Structures are given as structure tokens and as C-alpha cells.
Amino acid sequence: MKVIDQFKNKKVLVLGLAKSGESAARLLDKLGAIVTVNDGKPFEDNPAAQSLLEEGIKVITGGHPLELLDEEFALMVKNPGIPYNNPMIEKALAKGIPVLTEVELAYLISEAPIIGITGSNGKTTTTTMIGEVLTAAGQHGLLSGNIGYPASQVAQTASDKDTLVMELSSFQLMGVQEFHPEIAVITNLMPTHIDYHGSFSEYVAAKWNIQNKMTAADFLVLNFNQDLAKDLTSKTEATVVPFSTLEKVDGAYLEDGQLYFRGEVVMAANEIGVPGSHNVENALATIAVAKLRDVDNQTIKETLSAFGGVKHRLQFVDDIKGVKFYNDSKSTNILATQKALSGFDNSKVVLIAGGLDRGNEFDELVPDITGLKKMVILGQSAERVKRAADKAGVAYVEATDIADATRKAYELATQGDVVLLSPANASWDMYANFEVRGDLFIDTVAELKE
């Protein structure tokens, strides 16, 4: 990692632990900062805080006392999940204390070039595809960021022979200043996380931070299926490389069942190892990045053909007596579920949907769920999802939790059917995250098979 001294002897407050906060605290300590960690979880239930304290890092747990900010901190590094209307963050900003996320730290110390991937849907799959293609080409793509590996941790061991392939959420991108990828990808932009950002325009602005420091020597890969992406083209200094499944573009595109890059066939769409129209878009974005990094077509084709998907994103779980189970717990919004359903015959699908109520109706989902065999509905948003099912003429049953929903869906299915968990909602009404929800689905399927 690069040796930097800008944090040496500076007082830094790390707000919120989890993986990224813990990694940031250790990195800042290594860089010579005077670190204080503040986390809301009680100390006795907080192994990360206990470990940091043993290493000599100051830890304050069990709440977020505003008087902590009476100290003169030079910087705050916040967990990306903590909203900016948190009183601690509001007070820090009012005092002129910069508030960053650990993604910024990763950029500052990284010897490796960075490819950043953001968007509303497809981030994890596209990030994984890019990482696998680059690694197959000998460029060693290191996955990091929102994909589960703290960027500031991975960056510490990356060399200039590696490439950091970083999945970036809007939450993370709100906390960057100097962050500068050589290639950035925005998979798509849809209204989501409005409860965090306040409006769609603010959400887009957060995503757009990915390109703030890019120049004409850098590449911004945009989805030209969306007019919004086309409109944004004039607002960046970066060189835009488009991808599209709807039209021929000066980049990566779909035509007559083939995936092209600038007029050259790379592979057939039906050779991609995972189903669904959304995965064609993900593959096109990957092809654009790979070609910009001089990866040959054969390597791209072989890697994407062998690609098995990622956990919780249209993940095939098992087959029980001819009923196939798919875990798409990562589909936390309407568009993601629409794309998941596009890969199946609705008449053979029992869909499990519902979760955190963000106040939105599901009318957009009605055409996509029409013709489903059945639905199993759960969660805070159940009443809203039921209204959409009624409009689509789909029969449904209600469930109390994911285990109950999985069992009921199996009872409704017959040989040749698919049980699809694709909630179109976040998990936080019942579960800590979509991974927990998906793992419970997987565990219940295993129990059903016994």
C-alpha cells in the first residue's frame, strides 16, 4: 500500500463498526492517526469493539453521545449505512469536520488501479463478472467494497499488478472527495433508497460522485437503455463508453442474439452462464470494461460462459421432486424482481415477495406478475403487494416469515415448477440484511429435502 502521512497524529472519529468501520479503524491506526471508535452496540455484545480495544484503540459503545464531538476531530469516517441526518453526522458537518467513508481511504492508499461499479441493480453480478474476467486474463481482479470485502482492507495488500474491482453503493459514494477510478460503471439508475436520500435526484447525485474526479483519460461505462444515462453524458469529463440491448452503440451492444463490442462479435447472448435479460446487460457492461483493459474475446467468452452467478442473486438452490428453488433475496426493488421474472415462464412460478414497507405501491410490477401460478406474500409491505397481486389476478397466500413462506410455496408447487424468492423489497423489517433472508431460504429448502 502507499505510505501516506496525511492522517499522522490527526484525531479521527470512526462512527459505526461493522466490517467497513472495523477495517477503517485499523487502517487509520496503522497510518498513525489518533483513532476513536463509536458504535451503538453495547460493549459486551460487540466483539469488534472488544478486539479494537485490545489493540489499543479508544472505543466508546452503547450509544452515540453528541458531547463526543466536543473534541477537536480532524475527520469522521462513517459506516455507509448511517444516514446523514444522524445527529452525530449533522453536528460534525456543522463544525466543519469532513465526513468520509472507508472507500475514500482505500483510494488514498491503493497502489492498484481501480474499477468502480455502481447502479441500482446488477452491481454485485457485474462486479463479480468483471473480477473473474480480469483474473482469467492475468490482471488479478480483487473484489472489494459493497460486495462484502472492505475496500480499505483489500487495498492494503493490493499491488500495482492487481486491479481493485469495487462495488460501490450510493451510501459509500456520498462520502468520497478525491476518489478516482480509471474505469467506472453505472449499471442503471432507478428510484430506490429514497428513504435514505430524500429524493431520486439526490440519489442520482450520490451515484454520480463516482465520476467527479475522472478526466478524458478515464472511461465511464453507461447503460444507454436509459434516457437518463444519455442525458448525463454531457455532464462528465470522462470518456463515455455506452452499452445497450436496444440499439447499436459505440461500445457494447446486443444485435441478432450476439454480443458485440464496436462492431466485433464477442459471444452469443445465449452462451452467458446465467439466465435473464438483466444478465445480458451485466455481460455487456463487463465486455465494455474487459475490452477497455485489452482482454481478448476468447477469455471473455470462456469466463462469462462458465459464470455461475453470485449468492442471493438468482442463485439456484436445489431441485426437490422436480421443483426448482431460486434464491434472489438481493432483489430489493421492483426492477430487480421484474428482471428476475423475465427469465422464467410465469405459469410455472410461485413467487415469494414482500418485505420492508418504504411507502411505494407495486403497480409497476403488475404486468410482470400477471400469469404467475401463485404468490406467497409476507412482510410490512404485504398489503401493498397484495393489491398488486389482485390487479394482476394472481392468487396468493400470506406467510409469517421466510421459512413459513418457503414451505407454503413448496406446497403450492408441482413437478416442473419454480419457487422464486425475489422479494422486490428490502429485508430490514424482519432481517438484518438480504443475506440473512436468503440464507434462511436456503436452510429451509435443505430441511424440505430431508
From Swiss-Prot:
Keywords, ordered alphabetically: ATP-binding, Cell cycle, Cell division, Cell shape, Cell wall biogenesis/degradation, Cytoplasm, Ligase, Nucleotide-binding, Peptidoglycan synthesis
EC number(s) stated in the UniProt entry for this protein: 6.3.2.9
Pathways involved: Cell wall biogenesis; peptidoglycan biosynthesis
An example Gene Ontology CC term for this record: cytoplasm
Binding positions for ATP per the UniProt entry: 119-125
Reaction equation(s) it catalyzes: UDP-N-acetyl-alpha-D-muramoyl-L-alanine + D-glutamate + ATP = UDP-N-acetyl-alpha-D-muramoyl-L-alanyl-D-glutamate + ADP + phosphate + H(+)
Compartments where found: Cytoplasm
UniProt GO BP: cell division; cell wall organization; peptidoglycan biosynthetic process; regulation of cell shape
Single GO term (MF): UDP-N-acetylmuramoylalanine-D-glutamate ligase activity
Family stated for the protein in its record: Belongs to the MurCDEF family.
Family annotation (NCBIfam families): murD
PANTHER family: UDP-N-ACETYLMURAMOYLALANINE--D-GLUTAMATE LIGASE
The protein's name: UDP-N-acetylmuramoylalanine--D-glutamate ligase
Provenance organism: Streptococcus pneumoniae (strain CGSP14)
Gene giving rise to this polypeptide: murD
